[in-house]
C-alpha cells in the first residue's frame, strides 16, 4: 500500500451461486460472512449452504483477487513470469484445484478478435487497453492495468455422509465422520489468497529492482531507482 498498490480478494462464487460483476460493491464484502461483494448473491449463497448442511454435504467455490496500481513491467518474459509465479503461490494453498488469470478458461472458447486487448491513447496521452481479457499480464509481465486472478476451491472433504473407504488391511469399509464441519471453506481462504498474492507481487517487485546492473549501482549509492 505504501507503493500505491492495493490487493483485494473476495468470494465470487459459492457452489453454483455467482456474484453479478456489474453490481459489485466492495464495501459489501465486510457486511456478510461469506465475503461476497454482492448482497443478493450472498443471501442466495447462505440459503444454498443451509441446504448443504441439511443434506450433510459440502460445496466448493471461487475466490477472485484484484491488484490495482501495479506498474507495467513487473515479472519476466520466461523464467519468472508474473502469472506463473502467482499460479504457483495460489496453487500452493490447500484445497485449491484451479487457477486462472483474466478470462482464463473462458478464453479457450473465444476468437482472437474477441480475446485480443486493443490499445488506444488515453486521456493522459499514454497508451491504454480498451478491454482487460488478459487480466493485467502480457508476455509474463504486468501491463499496468488491473491484475485479475481467480482460485477454484474443492468442496470440503469432511462430510457427515457415510462413505466407502479401504482400511489398512485392504478391506472395504464404510466411514462416517463425526463432529462439526464447514459446508464450504472458501470464506476462510479469502485472506489467504489475498496474502499470497501480495507476497508474490512484493517478491517480484524486489526482483525487478535488481534486474539491471544500473539499478543495483543506484541502490548501493543510495540514489533513487
Language-model segments: what does each one mean?
Residues 55-172:
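Glycine-rich anion/phosphate-binding loop at the beta-strand->alpha-helix junction
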Residues 1-78:
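Glycine-rich, mobile lid/loop segments that gate access to catalytic sites or pores
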Residues 35-43, 76, 80, 84, ...:
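Electropositive phosphate-/nucleotide-binding environments in soluble metabolic enzymes
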